[in-house]
Amino acid sequence: MQQSTDLQNLLHSVHKKSYPAYKALKGSYPFNNYILSIDHVQGDPFASPSHISIRIPHKTAGFPKEYYKDSVISMTLSDYLARQFEKQIVHYTFRAKGSGKSGLISISHCGQEVLKRTACEITEKEIIARFFIGFPANGRTINATELEKILFDFLPVCVQKAFLYKNTNHQELQAAIFLAEDQTCIRKQLSSGNLVAFVADGSILPRESGISSRPMKDSVPFISPESLRVTMTLPHKGEISGMGIPRGITLIVGGGYHGKSTLLNALELGVYNHISGDGREYVITDDTALKLRSEDGRFIKDVDISLFINDLPNQKDTRCFSTEDASGSTSQAAGIVEGMEAGSRVFLLDEDTSATNFMVRDTFMQEVISREKEPITPFLERAEDLYKKAEISTILVAGSSEAFFHIADTIIQMDSYHPVDISEKVRALCGKYPLNPVKASAFAFPTSHRIMKKQAPSIRSHGRNAGRPEQLKIKVHGKDGFLIGKQDVDLRYVEQLIDPEQTAALGLLLKYAIEKLADDHRTVADIIEILSGQLEQNGLSFLSGGSYISCGYAMPRLQEIYSCFNRYRR
């Protein structure tokens, strides 16, 4: 391995040369407390910045061993360190001058949720931080003097302050670790307490705005109805009380603007841990919960939707259904079946974003259009079977139909952001307004059919590499999806994707599956099972192919991996 003095000598040797000469810097160099690696050098000062990583041995970093004891605590520490490093580099970014992205220093920006990111990874031996630096230039002429400032003056200070335990705020870090342990404890108690979600008293659910996930100031704190209040004992916070949502079918109702969707939004993001001060730190949902909605125009391939749709006029087989342009009802049926395959134990639905004809058929409509002429079995007629036979609970926001009141186990009315348990009151009313007997066909578990097709690589038609296979490239469109090769994967309605870095990771996972796992025999479920094992064992690093993985990727849940792969048109 070269020494840091070798890096200085290289910098002096490339100073004022043409920008591509920076490529000579690629390699690893030991500094006092860490090893600096220049993994990828940008092509010019206006291109995406260079990829840098540093490795700090645990002995040097000095963090307590108990902070590495399990995956959740390790992820919390990684998240904390990435946030601390970002706080340090903000003082130095663009302090080195030049053209284009010269002087940029950046790392993943962590939001309100705690995610496992490639920006900071903890292994058995070391802490690895990955970030970006814009190598300075004047025009397209190397300015190595400015890069030397970044690597030898700015960076060592940032590393010392962010990644050495002796320089961190011990109390703040311990509070983050303790919060994560308390959140894990609540998740465990959901299962043992026959609950699907918990919302602590005092939680702040409304957000600052539609483009901000920070808590709204002066909003109404959440207070549980007495009949749904549960008390949990946590290892650090001690006793905490709040609303426990039982397994089964839960209905959330209330007038417009009273907080129904706000509660549902908090529950759908309760699959993630939140940082202290977010207001939703103790809003915890079963981590397999899946938000579902209709998605007009969605691609569907070989999905068994016969649980909900049968006897189509064109005689199309709904046990292995495909379409390039799904209707709202068909897309929602497919989403539920795909969610079952992904192992979801809770479905979250909002009437506002659901297909009306998929959710319910009222008595009058049943009289006008007889059952034998209607191919759709509405969700209303399957929700109880989903719980009793498949052990999948439902939380539904509703406001326009009486029908769901008759099958709900728990009914919560939101009244000026205050939840009220009206279950008993509604049961008394249901006797006055009886529902027609359900005539749905027998419940049968859907069967997975979809085989992932092996894709022949495109062949370059011109240039010096003509005749060689083209590399499958990915272009990420924020949280909305990505372009892989020439195909768009649309993820706009996968609502529990919260960070563009998760979308980027999904692109890498799909690319790996296409190139390494698709063989015209494995199903999507088979492929995701292989990927899941790799992710659990090696994290996202296994996607590097023996090279390196950069900053800019965050771990998606298994449910979002399924959602992504099922939207890929192969």
Please tell me what each predicted stretch does.
Residues 1-185, 189-194, 205:
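N-terminal accessory targeting/assembly segments
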Residues 240-272:
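Glycine-rich phosphate-binding P-loop
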Residues 298, 311-329, 361-376:
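Flexible beta-alpha connector loops of hexameric P-loop NTPases
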Residues 320-354:
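Phosphate-binding/switch loop-helix module in NTP-utilizing enzymes
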Residues 340-383, 387, 400-406, 410-428:
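Conserved P-loop NTPase nucleotide-binding/switch module
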Residues 414-503:
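Conserved P-loop NTPase
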